Amino acid sequence: MTDYDDYEDRSGVVEEELLDFDRAMLDFQAMFPSLSNSHIEYVLRKYDGDVSATINELLYDNTPTTTTSESIPHGGDLTKLRQRRHEINEKLRENQKFLDTVTDVEIARAYEDQQLALLLEHREVNTLISEEKKKKSCSDSSSIQESRRHVKIPGKNSKNSKISVNKAKKLEPRRRSDEDRVPDGPYIGEGEVKSENFAAKIKETLRKASGSRISRLFSAP
């Protein structure tokens, strides 16, 4: 093999190792949308196209100051927890789209790392949502029991007393009506009046009969 052929082979190896700068920029921009293009280009040129080193620094620059646990809302707010879960789901879908189109191995690994972190956060958020639901359910049941304690349920004695009172109320008008019919003095009905008249008539008849009998005695010879 000639020196020319050796040079040609080595130059071919060098050409295969060269990075497609434009393609790398597109991949990094899709992977780190929050970072500016100038910053991505600066880091890429800083490491002379080293994909692994570039990804590590861009990941560090793109990492928020708060940790995953700190970014999750606490304090029993189910609305915020559900909102955070929705955001994680959206980010997981976006990363999956990038994973389906990315060609660089290092970039694909970085996406997979992000997916893993998001899945862990998603599981933690689901756990917190379940705990808050249980707390809310227990709180509602305890409040219902507390409200039932303040409601007085009548027992057997009170029920019987209410029935006796109601019966007394119903009987009271009857008793009063019967008492109103009784006069202050002795009662003289129609039968007694008729009997007195009949007795008077008998006395009058006897008196007349006795008078006529006496007159006949005196008139006899």
UniProtKB/Swiss-Prot annotation:
PANTHER family: CUE DOMAIN CONTAINING PROTEIN 1 (PTHR13467), CUE DOMAIN-CONTAINING PROTEIN 1 (PTHR13467:SF3). Residues 156-166 have a biased composition (Low complexity). It holds the Pfam family CUE. Residues 169-183 have a biased composition (Basic and acidic residues). InterPro entries: CUE, CUEDC1, UBA-like_sf. Disulfide bonds: none annotated. Residues 131-194 are annotated as: Disordered. GO terms for molecular function: ubiquitin binding. Residues 20-63 form the CUE domain. It comes from the Eukaryota. SUPFAM superfamilies: UBA-like. This is Uncharacterized protein F43C1.5.
